Amino acid sequence: MAKECSRIIDLSDASTDSIFLFGARQTGKTTLLLNKFAGCRYYDLLENNVRRRLLTNPSQLREELLLAADGELVVIDEIQLVPELLDEVHWLITRKKMRFVLSGSSARKLKRKGVNTLGGRALLKRLFPLVSAEIDDFDLNRALHYGMLPPHYFSSQNMVWKRIEAYVGVYLKEEIKAEALVRNLSAFNHFLRAAALTSGEMVNYSNIAQDCGIDVKTVKEYFSILDETMIGYMVPSFRKVAKRRVTQAPRFYFFDVSIVNFLLGRRSMQPGTAEYGHAFEHLMIQEVVAYLSYSGHADALSYWHTYSGLEVDAVLGDGAVAIEFKAVAQVQPKHLKGLKAFSDEFPQARLVIVSLDSVARLVNNVEVRPAVEFLRLLWSGSIF
């Protein structure tokens, strides 16, 4: 079940600027670049002969492009495989006013090697897995189970888990082991499951360290690896001063719900179960994160949790919108406690609860939005 989707990410800045396009493996970077920049000079560093040639002599890139027109646009796919090329790219940008689109799946590889990151001469963009607005006839249940990486979402049922298993295996082998990012691959593998168990919850480094038999410093380093290899991200707590004391620890989410489903063995989830609820929240956060990044508000997401246990899953901006995600067939007053408490602190906030309700309604100033309708409103810019 293969299909190409029109991606929402805006790369039009490439008409005037250079771009770093980061994204996890199989998010569709190569397909996107080939579609958006058809006809441009293209270096695919996954091709062995191209990679070997430029690894042996990085200055050959400059020599080849000296013959190109000033200001020409050049695409280099998987730049982290030959980071030494960035010195040549820098020279070509400053001397020949050339523009580059540089893709990569690991910012960590560039940081670790202390390579030239172009001194702010390239804009940073991030490609996420597919989002609902990019898929005709979006299937919520399929997305909850298979995730939104193109090869997984469009996979047949009898192949999808093999592909997800292979994806995690390749990540461990090529991103972690081959790059010697960790000394103990077994401990890191154990950590991945511990991170999956706490995905969407406040991060407790001490508990994870104890569960994995490693120290807290190592746990923090492992989370940093997940972030810099695009496999996960932290959502900070909302810290605007108010009456109630709130927790400060961030929440962690894997970049795609399929990773958590695989690590925890969630193959067939039924509505009404805790695991279905966790996957539902994860998918909704995944969509919100992508929307905020693509719309230029990448740092606008936080969550709110008081010491008394009241919480809101997503706070947008400076408290402008508060959103709770509940995979229930019909929202009840008990599901609104966190939002109402947030409203007591920040009365100007727009309150939204996203659920499996069949129709939208307004309950005590809280918008009850069916999940698919919420996603449509989100991507039309009607939520934030």
Language-model features: where?
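Short glycine-rich substrate-engagement loop in P-loop NTPases that contacts/grips substrate
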Residues: 43-73
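Hydrophobic anchor at the beta1->P-loop junction of P-loop NTPases
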Residues: 21
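Conserved lysine of the Walker
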Residues: 29-30
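Short regulatory helix/loop adjacent to the ATP-binding pocket of P-loop NTPases
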Residues: 108-123, 139
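Domain-level recognition of nuclease-like catalytic cores that cleave nucleotide substrates
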Residues: 357-384
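Structural recognition of the conserved hydrophobic beta-strand(s) that form the central parallel beta-sheet
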Residues: 75, 99-105
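Accessory nucleic acid-recognition modules appended to NTPase machines
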Residues: 158-320, 327
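Pre-Walker A adenine-sensing motif
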Residues: 1-13
